[in-house]
């Protein structure tokens, strides 16, 4: 198999053999398009919600997710089946860097974009290093105990933001609770693809119930569809220019460490499902993700990462063809060029978004615990216990450190604190033999 060449995709139908379609195989055009729609739907919920939580344009973020996925496809030589969508890891640091209040468009979006570009640059450099020397150094620097602690700290750091966003009125608070229940019911009582799209389906159901409560029963502020009716079907999204603020860059750039760990985990999952060795492409995958993040941030989009939602779709369908993700990317780009679609997104009530954010931020925190469970992390070891305890409090309490005009926020201190504490506390006395047990004669 050529390292830098594109594969020769062989035509295959899902009706043949076991129905498994490998990354270097393809479906007929119609089936590829349908699978592309399915992957576009799978990424939709989070790719729309994350930029809204940061005050970015969701329409532009969807467009850039499609462009970023195509860039990733070309850089990896069409051999890694993945979709790049808006990353939740940026939410906390972008809000901290810009002081965004969670409503409307972020007035300090420019400095956030500069930080996203800086993060993408760090991400790309790490990818280039991985291409040269492999991933062992990353796994030693950030073992599962560190990765899990940092991911959980991010979720806990975001918790106050989610709660404050739904505290404007008693009605908003109850509608947020209703949204949480809608998503929870979808997660528990549905199966298959509907269950995998729990955020999207839950949002739709919650919006419908909110519309009934307000537009029909008059219990709250009615949803206004004027912008939707006046918006054009096709047009350019709103682009923004980045500004490079050193403090914002210092705060946002460390997210690259989380994205690297997340991407490596996703690639290992894909390798396990496809039976293909993805190690030769890990460096290029990181470079592709980093460049896509820089490109997105340069025009006003959010930082991107490979999506677990789409990995779940592959696990269900057994279709791993990389051409399916090209189709999904094209669909996302078409949606990004529709102002009417963007206007429809902006009709989602703030209370519904806040309720969804409670679930999403909670799931981020739980994902950290899942990393520990899956990797059998031993929290009975004092070194691990102290590192995790300190990391969680630094993140949840938004502990900040200021040095020479630079301020490192809670997520930054939690990330670097976890790495440093793990390096200091995980030492073992490997040269000291265990005490010898002497058996005395009776």
What is the meaning of each model-derived region?
Residues 1-34, 219-238, 272-275, 285, ...:
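Intrinsically disordered, low-complexity non-transmembrane regions of multi-pass membrane transporters
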Residues 15, 19-30, 55-73, 251-322, ...:
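Membrane-embedded helical hairpins/re-entrant loop segments and their flanking transmembrane helices
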Residues 53-56, 78, 99-107, 131, ...:
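Juxtamembrane helix-boundary/capping and inter-helix hinge elements in multi-pass membrane proteins
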Residues 106-216, 327-436:
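Membrane-embedded alpha-helical modules
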């Amino acid at each position: 198999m050529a390292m830098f060449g594109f594969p020769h995709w062989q035509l295959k139908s899902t009706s043949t053999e076991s129905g498994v379609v490998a990354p270097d195989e393809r479906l007929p055009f119609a089936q590829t398009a349908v699978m592309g729609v399915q992957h576009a739907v799978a990424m939709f919920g989070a790719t729309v919600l994350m930029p809204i939580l940061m005050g970015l344009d969701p329409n532009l973020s969807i467009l850039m997710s499609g462009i970023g996925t195509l860039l990733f496809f070309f850089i990896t030589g069409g051999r890694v089946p993945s979709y790049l969508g808006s990353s939740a890891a940026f939410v906390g640091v972008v809000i901290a860097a810009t002081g965004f209040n969670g409503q409307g468009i972020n007035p300090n979006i420019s400095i956030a974009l500069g930080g996203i570009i800086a993060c993408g640059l760090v991400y790309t450099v790490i990818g280039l290093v991985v291409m040269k020397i492999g991933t062992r150094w990353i796994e030693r620097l950030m073992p599962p105990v560190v990765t899990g602690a940092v991911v959980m700290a991010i979720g806990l750091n975001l918790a106050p933001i989610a709660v404050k966003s739904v505290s404007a009125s008693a009605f908003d608070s109850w509608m947020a609770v209703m949204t949480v229940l809608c998503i929870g019911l979808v997660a528990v009582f549905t199966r298959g693809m509907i269950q995998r799209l729990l955020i999207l389906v839950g949002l739709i159901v919650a919006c419908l119930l909110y519309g009934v409560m307000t537009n029909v029963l008059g219990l709250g502020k009615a949803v206004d569809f004027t912008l939707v009716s006046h918006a054009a079907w096709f047009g350019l999204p709103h682009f923004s220019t980045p500004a490079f603020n050193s403090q914002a860059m210092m705060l946002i750039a460390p997210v690259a460490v989380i994205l690297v760990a997340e991407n490596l985990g996703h690639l290992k999952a894909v390798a396990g499902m496809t039976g293909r060795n993805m190690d030769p492409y890990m460096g290029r995958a990181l470079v592709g993700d980093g460049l896509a993040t820089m490109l997105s941030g340069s025009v006003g989009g959010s930082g991107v990462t490979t999506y677990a939602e789409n990995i779940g779709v592959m696990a269900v369908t057994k279709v791993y063809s990389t051409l399916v993700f090209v189709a999904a990317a094209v669909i996302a780009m078409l949606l990004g060029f529709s102002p009417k679609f963007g206007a429809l997104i902006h009709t989602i009530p703030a209370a519904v978004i806040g309720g969804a954010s409670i679930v999403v931020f909670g799931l981020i925190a739980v994902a950290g615990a899942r990393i520990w469970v899956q990797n059998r992390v031993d929290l009975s070891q004092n070194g691990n216990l102290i590192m995790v305890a300190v990391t969680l409090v630094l993140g949840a309490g938004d502990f900040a450190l200021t040095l020479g005009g630079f301020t490192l926020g809670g997520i930054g201190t939690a990330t670097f604190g976890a790495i440093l504490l793990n390096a200091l506390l995980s030492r073992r006395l490997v040269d000291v033999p265990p005490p010898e047990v002497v058996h005395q004669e009776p």
